[in-house]
């Protein structure tokens, strides 16, 4: 607890220095506009309050654009079928552009008369070679056919367990383990993204995500004291999976990112959105990517 308080104090101290540099003698205002608050759901507003209390310098990132995932107007009850379609979309979009993924999904929808097939229908259709051939013609590789069938089997055979699993709270690791163990093509990263966009879990953090790594590099670039403290207090080193890549920004190891993110717990999912925005150099492209993430 003592160490966490020290990190919190360093984050806030570095933030105050940065704000003072930019604002000079102008007063600091970190209260989100009432209209902004009214449009977002309560748990997101609570997250913003917590994050700004920890680091006021993040105010502009939060204020400048709405967060589609947390808008009241986008909140609808999700069914087991909705979860299946979201995970199926994740599989379809792997290793290809968003536009290509949308095109493939649209062809699947067209094949099934205007709606994405539910898991029970796909479970039966994967037993029929002729139907499998029709699905594959929509643009699915052999590997993605295997992945999609695996997902349909998982939902069909374990739907009662899944309903219970997805309906519980504070079981993020259990959800990740179940998806990764039972569904071919769903790894830890995909499972974490589903926790955020599908189950709306608020305390997820994925240091292995390239955008998060880039945003974190920018975030820490003006916090020298915090960086020194994080480096000094390392106990267990968890190497970044993207460490070997050549980028023009510094890549931090996973343990450094995770330790820093703990300051913003239990709202690290929102902190991830902030880091994604910090990583972007094109606001319009960033907002479009967020919208696609919410829909996928």
UniProtKB/Swiss-Prot annotation:
Induction: By DNA damage. Its EC number is 3.2.2.21. The active site is at residue 209. Transmembrane segments: none annotated. The gene is MAG1. The keyword Hydrolase applies. It comes from Saccharomyces cerevisiae (strain ATCC 204508 / S288c) (Baker's yeast). The modification Phosphoserine is found at residue 110. Pfam families: HhH-GPD. GO terms for biological process: base-excision repair, AP site formation; DNA alkylation repair. It is an enzyme of class 3 (hydrolase). The lineage of its organism: Eukaryota, Fungi, Dikarya, Ascomycota, Saccharomycotina. One of its GO terms (cellular component) is protein-DNA complex. InterPro entries: Alkylbase_DNA_Glycosylase/TA (IPR051912), Alkylbase_DNA_glycsylse_CS (IPR000035), DNA_glycosylase (IPR011257), HhH-GPD_domain (IPR003265). Belongs to the alkylbase DNA glycosidase AlkA family. It is found in: Nucleus. This is DNA-3-methyladenine glycosylase. Hydrolysis of the deoxyribose N-glycosidic bond to excise 3-methyladenine or 7-methyladenine from the damaged DNA polymer formed by alkylation lesions. Its main location: nucleus. It catalyses: Hydrolysis of alkylated DNA, releasing 3-methyladenine, 3-methylguanine, 7-methylguanine and 7-methyladenine. The keyword Phosphoprotein applies. The record marks 189 as: Determinant for substrate specificity and/or activity. CDD domains: ENDO3c (cd00056). Keywords: DNA damage, DNA repair, Hydrolase, Nucleus, Phosphoprotein. SUPFAM superfamilies: DNA-glycosylase. One of its GO terms (molecular function) is alkylated DNA binding.
């Amino acid at each position: 607890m003592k160490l966490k308080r020290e990190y919190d104090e360093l984050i806030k101290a570095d933030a105050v220095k940065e704000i003072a540099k930019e604002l000079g003698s102008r007063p600091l205002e970190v209260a989100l506009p009432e209209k902004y608050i009214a449009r977002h759901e309560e748990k997101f507003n609570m997250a913003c309050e917590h994050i700004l209390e920890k680091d006021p310098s993040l105010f502009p990132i939060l204020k400048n654009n709405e967060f589609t995932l947390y808008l009241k107007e986008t909140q609808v009850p999700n069914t087991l079928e909705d979860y299946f379609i979201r995970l199926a979309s994740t599989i379809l979009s792997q290793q290809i552009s968003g536009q290509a993924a949308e095109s493939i999904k649209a062809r699947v929808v067209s094949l099934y008369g205007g709606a994405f097939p539910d898991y029970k229908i796909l479970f039966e259709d994967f037993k029929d070679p002729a139907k499998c051939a029709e699905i594959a013609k929509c643009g699915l590789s052999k590997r993605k056919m295997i992945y999609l069938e695996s997902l349909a089997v998982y939902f069909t055979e374990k739907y009662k367990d899944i309903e219970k699993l997805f309906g519980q709270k504070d079981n993020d690791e259990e959800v990740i383990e179940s998806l990764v163990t039972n569904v071919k093509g769903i790894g830890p990263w995909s499972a974490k993204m589903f926790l955020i966009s599908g189950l709306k879990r608020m305390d997820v953090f994925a240091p292995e995500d390239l955008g998060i790594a880039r945003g974190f590099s920018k975030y820490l670039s003006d916090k020298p004291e915090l960086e020194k403290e994080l480096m000094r207090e390392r106990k267990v080193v968890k190497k970044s999976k993207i460490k070997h890549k050549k980028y023009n920004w510094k890549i931090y190891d996973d343990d450094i990112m995770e330790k820093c993110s703990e300051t913003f717990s239990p709202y690290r999912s929102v902190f991830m959105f902030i880091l994604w925005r910090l990583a972007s150099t094109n606001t319009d492209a960033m907002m479009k990517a967020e919208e696609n993430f919410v829909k996928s």
